[in-house]
Curated annotation (Swiss-Prot):
EC number: 1.14.-.-
tRNA processing as UniProt keyword: yes
Lineage per the UniProt record: Bacteria, Pseudomonadati, Pseudomonadota, Alphaproteobacteria, Rhodobacterales
Protein name (Swiss-Prot/TrEMBL): tRNA uridine(34) hydroxylase
Species annotation: Jannaschia sp. (strain CCS1)
HAMAP family in alphabetical order: TrhO
Length: 301
């Protein structure tokens, strides 16, 4: 059994580059894999590994400047969710194209237990800050879908649509809390006064709120091998198209357009014959590695 920890924390790192090697060393020593991003505005990532290794990494992060209040979401997985460890430097821990925002000036956190009451209020507009392919498999009842392909598209979407939300309070949510928290900082910079975000994101809501009281509909896409989870963070029967990186259901896998690692109904007409030939070769190498009991990994970070 693997422990999976999803985390982020906004704080000011004077020299994030200096934090990279020690963090990587602690993770490697504990057999922890996954992805961690360091930037001047903080840290973000999802990691998986044995209990002792995860505890060591989290303790190290909590000891970093301004990170004593670090919070994270835990779940478990029966298979290793990540094949390798990446610790990378970025200009933002979540790319919005707005690195100058003050992450300390954000909207009001709303606990999962209080979320239903907020989003049911008639003067509240609920906005899903995730990408379109994530929203497709699940969202909150009545939420606005910006239909963005990337989080970087959100500022432009807001500028084009903000007139729709005049005189309304704004409630925003995302997978683990980081995108909606940064979105509230952006909206506050734009002059929106009453803006809220779901503390801990959808994952915390699904963990805390009983299914019979939930306003969540469908599954929640996650960026690891589980692909999607539901209430209680139980894994759902979704897979990932390795060609377009979008979630696919059992029904879509039964479609004639689906070929493992090569195409799915969504991307069948998007990629060229040359692309598909390359994907087939990659899939062949993955199968050969699996038959030998080896992991098919790219170069380390």
């Amino acid at each position: 059994m693997y422990v999976v920890a999803a985390l982020y924390h906004f704080t000011r790192f004077a020299d994030p580059d200096a934090l990279r090697a020690p963090l990587r060393s602690i993770a490697e020593a504990g057999n922890v894999r996954g992805s961690l991003l360091l930037a001047p505005e903080g840290i973000n990532g999802t990691i998986a590994g044995p209990r002792a290794g995860i505890d060591a990494v989290l303790a190290h992060i909590k000891g970093l400047p301004g990170c004593a209040g670090l919070e994270w979401k835990e779940s478990t997985a029966t298979a290793a969710p990540f094949g390798k460890l990446k610790v990378r430097l970025k200009t933002e821990i979540v790319s919005m194209g707005a690195p100058g925002l003050d992450p300390a000036d954000v909207g009001t956190h709303v606990a999962p237990a209080e979320w239903n009451a907020l989003i049911s209020a008639p003067d509240v507009a609920v906005i899903d800050t995730r990408n379109a392919y994530e929203v497709e498999i699940g969202t909150f009842e009545g939420a606005v879908d910006p239909a963005t392909e990337s989080f970087r598209d959100f500022p432009a979407w807001w500028q084009a649509n903000k007139h729709r939300f005049a005189n309304q309070r704004i409630a925003m949510f995302c997978t683990g809390g980081i995108r909606c928290e940064k979105s509230t900082a952006y909206l506050k910079e734009q002059g929106v006064e009453e803006v809220f975000h779901l503390k801990g994101g959808i994952l915390k809501y699904l963990e805390d709120v009983p299914e019979d009281q939930s306003l969540w509909q469908g599954g929640c896409f996650v960026f690891d091998e589980r692909v999607a989870v539901g209430h209680g963070l139980a894994e759902l029967p979704f897979d990932l198209c390795r060609a377009c990186r979008h979630p696919i259901s059992c029904e879509e896998k039964a479609d004639l357009a689906f070929e493992e690692g090569v195409s799915c109904p969504r991307c069948m007409d998007v990629h060229s014959d040359a692309d598909r030939a390359r994907f087939r070769e990659r899939q062949k190498q993955i199968a050969l590695a699996k038959a030998r009991g080896e992991a098919h990994l790219g170069a380390g970070d």
